[in-house]
């Protein structure tokens, strides 16, 4: 029995090491997924703040200032705000406006923002002068952008007739 004890201890230790390695991988996946969710929710809050500003200032065109976004959108991190931008463009028809928010995030962030807003089809990914919605069941046809947005950026595109 004495010669089996080291073998049994080795097998048990190997089992614990395998279990620990498996748990470490799961935690890493959950951390990455949590970051995507957090970015998706932050992008949704950013878009909502820009939209609130636009609704309160219906003749505005240009880039909504960061100070106004933080006033309407609550606590968004300075690191997040440094990555995102927006533009409000006149359509030239009556008082129409197109509000575009964008940032260099993955498609997963657009999907999370869409899911967090009840599958809002205004979230998607830019292809430069076009964009495609990330909403579940949305048409996959590329839609035109009124201004060029860097390709691969997550976007929220909303057209309003004020």
Language model: regions and residue ranges:
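N-terminal signal-anchor/signal peptide hydrophobic helix marking the start
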Residues: 1-13
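Membrane-proximal N-terminal amphipathic helix
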Residues: 31-58
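Aliphatic-rich helix starts adjacent to a transmembrane/signal segment
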Residues: 12-41
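Extracytoplasmic/secreted envelope proteins and their assembly/folding machinery
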Residues: 43, 47, 66, 110-112
